[in-house]
Amino acid sequence: MMQALTNPFPIGSSSLIHCMTNEISCEMLANGILALGCKPVMADDPREVLDFTKQSQALFINLGHLSAEKEKAIRMAALYANQSSLPMVVDAVGVTTSSIRKSLVKDLLDYRPTVLKGNMSEIRSLVGLKHHGVGVDASAKDQETEDLLQVLKDWCQTYPGMSFLVTGPKDLVVSKNQVAVLENGCTELDWITGTGDLVGALTAVFLSQGKTGFEASCLAVSYLNIAAEKIVVQGMGLEEFRYQVLNQLSLLRRDENWLDTIKGEAYE
């Protein structure tokens, strides 16, 4: 599988990525998208949301800080994406706790997102498996992958055009015909908020460049994890680590051989 991935850099066109995300990670996502060579826009007002979605090359929907107005805008943008075949990533933030968010994600499945993303607890909750998630965080008790992989394979038969991206100590990417178990990363990424959201935004970037949902998911989660691995963290504080994550995102794309450092396996 690693050999099947091709280097997406340099970015061929400076795509516009529409992020409907939360206020907490908004700035990090914008800078991360810029670091890869694309352009971000953040618009979630129902009065203008379609103006920006129609100009975009990919849509990223993140359910953090959901409100009634934002939900209305999300539904409008998702419907447009479905009708116009615009690549779409849905990040199921907080569905372990919020019945409103879980219901919204299940409705968004009707719009056939290209990628459905979440942590282990969130995805287990969505597909009806036992979970221990609290708030928006995954539980260490939910890291068993064998039962989850089987259920996700079944879901991919129902939604054949969609890939699942499940983040955790080992990241899972599941599509109708392929499964990847990826092992890059470092625990220090948990030091700062928004890194999971950033993976979703980077997935949208790679979708805008013509990658499949499976390819874009593998590239996005591996790219962030490998960038983080390059940071020397001994004695480093939170803010410096956050700065270096964004710094490495802009530098790693210069390495023509970065794909060779992806750890993991894939099978059909």
From Swiss-Prot:
CDD domains: THZ_kinase. ATP binds at K117, T167. Signal peptide: none annotated. Its EC number is 2.7.1.50. The keyword Kinase applies. Substrate binds at M42, G194. Gene3D superfamilies: 3.40.1190.20. InterPro entries: Hyethyz_kinase, Ribokinase-like. Disulfide bonds: none annotated. GO terms for biological process: thiamine biosynthetic process; thiamine diphosphate biosynthetic process. Keywords: ATP-binding, Kinase, Magnesium, Metal-binding, Nucleotide-binding, Thiamine biosynthesis, Transferase. GO terms for molecular function: ATP binding; hydroxyethylthiazole kinase activity; magnesium ion binding. This is Hydroxyethylthiazole kinase 2. It comes from Streptococcus pneumoniae (strain CGSP14). The lineage of its organism: Bacteria, Bacillati, Bacillota, Bacilli, Lactobacillales.
